[in-house]
């Protein structure tokens, strides 16, 4: 049997460069991958704007909307970049703390937003 997305192991640099994690059969991001991607976004020209979280329970990948981030609307786009980055960073750090308390593994798919050229 081949490797499944739930096995993790996303290439964080490729995710950053592409602006999103892949779709099936690309691997999900693990919590550590998400932390590494967040670190990569600091000082860069992208930020994480959307996160889909999945609880891995046996053979099922259960969507966890309560652990997701859904941003990127017009109201987001008019805010200063540093404000958006700080808010996203705070959210993801809190999210990772919550995920650490979960019984089953939590994995992620993400989308990034690129800073508009000045």
Model-derived features: positions:
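Amphipathic alpha-helical interaction modules
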Residues: 24-72
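Exposed alpha-helical structural elements
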Residues: 11, 33-36, 87, 91
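Amphipathic alpha-helical binding modules
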Residues: 81-118
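Intrinsically disordered, low-complexity coil/linker segments enriched for acidic/polar
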Residues: 76-80
């Amino acid at each position: 049997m081949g490797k499944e997305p739930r096995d993790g192991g996303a290439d964080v640099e490729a995710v950053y460069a592409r602006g999103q994690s892949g779709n099936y059969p690309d691997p999900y991001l693990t919590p550590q991958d998400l932390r590494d991607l967040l670190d990569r976004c600091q000082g860069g020209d992208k930020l994480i704007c959307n996160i889909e979280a999945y609880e891995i329970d046996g053979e099922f990948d259960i969507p966890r909307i309560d652990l997701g981030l859904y941003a990127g609307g017009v109201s987001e786009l008019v805010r200063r970049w540093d404000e958006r980055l700080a808010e996203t960073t705070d959210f993801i750090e809190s999210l990772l703390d919550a995920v650490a308390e979960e019984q089953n593994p939590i994995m992620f798919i993400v989308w990034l937003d690129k800073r508009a050229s000045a």
